[in-house]
Amino acid sequence: VARLLVAPLLIALEKTIGSSEYLQFMKSFKYPLSGEFSFRRNVLSELRISSDWGIEVGVLSEMQRNFSPNNICQVDLADTYDHKHQDLSLDDETKGLSKMSIDIIKTFIKKLATQGNSFSRETFRSLKATYYRCALDMIDIYRSDATMNGLQFDSHTEEKAVELFAVNIMKAGDDFYVNPMDTPFIPTWSRVKSAIPDFLTKLNKAVSEDNKDNS
């Protein structure tokens, strides 16, 4: 998804709505969907976290909004990674990589909308076409890399994924129009403490009791 959706989508967004500090920031990450983050504790209280597969993109977006880029970095924690693959789910947009792609696209759309960008149906059609061309160009690059390194490369499967993601750009756009009041974040810890002042005490007690039961 990072190779075939996020990377070409960011390029397509730049071409469609114009470059911005936000898009440049997101493009700077080698693995924007790694799912591994480390923060100082004071950062978490005001962090608005997405409640779906857009969580990685959402967290990076919040960090870019709230902090200077020189306070943020990416690191390699290991030489190898145990990547958990999911099915493409061509026939069911509520599962697998299909749902993941829709959630990620919606997260980008909502983040850019909060920055004053307007999205019309024509914008989404242009974005879909631009993404598709960019993604196919990147597949050519990946194929060449695989050939140079003596690796097998399944062009058919790669292009099937790109075709699905292109369709899902329109689906994400339709959902953006149909559900304009959809809340994209779970409440921040600051809001939780404001609504339930003793929540953290109760949470700490519940975790302690749960640990006792499992010990």
Q: Can you annotate each of these PLM segments?
A:
Residues 51, 61-80:
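Catalytic donor-sugar/metal-binding loop of nucleotide-sugar-dependent glycosyltransferases
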Residues 73-94:
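Active-site donor/metal-binding and catalytic loop motifs
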Residues 32-34, 38-39, 50, 54:
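A conserved catalytic-core signature of glycosyltransferases
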Residues 3, 53-57:
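Short-chain dehydrogenase/reductase
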Residues 1-37:
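Acceptor/aglycone-binding surface of glycosyltransferases and processive sugar-polymer synthases
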Residues 87-215:
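Terminal low-complexity segments of carbohydrate-biosynthetic enzymes
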Residues 43-44:
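A generic structural signal for short hydrophobic patches within well-formed alpha-helices
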Residues 11-16, 66, 74, 104-111:
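Conserved, well-folded catalytic cores of nucleic-acid-processing
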